[in-house]
């Protein structure tokens, strides 16, 4: 995918990749694919064109660099990623760690959005009044300007955000859901999940308050 300042063009590109994304998805179970399609279309048709930002920018002081100069870093956090990983149970022992394949940047739209975030951060840094107090960019540096080079920088520096969620989605069972609208696990008796894993999509917000809301509502018998 190329670089897009026009969100409608990006949206059409994302929608055109739905079939190939489903073909390359980690599970080919028909129900899971239906759920993936529903979430994908929600992302592309509602979130992408909404006033809610697709990337969060965090500006913070990072101390002195090797030359003794003070540095400022900009962190970009993708809010509604299209890439989806998979969590595997490895044994029947609840104390054994599962196998996690996050598959970050496996969807080209995520690469495009992160690349645009790098360019936008640079634009902010070269615009007054911030530009009047900033020196030279140190990472990745001005020489990294071609899209392919920016993509390589992103791939080698990306990290996970502190919002683990979405592994036990609240969706209809025929769409691969794990819990119903009352937070009960399908196929089990009176077993509920009340944590961030039931959110089917990432929020452009911190997940902890949403967990408190779920837990509070359940404690009052609303679920």
Please name every model-derived segment:
Residues 2-204, 209-210, 218-223:
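FAD-dependent oxidoreductase catalytic-site/capping-region signature
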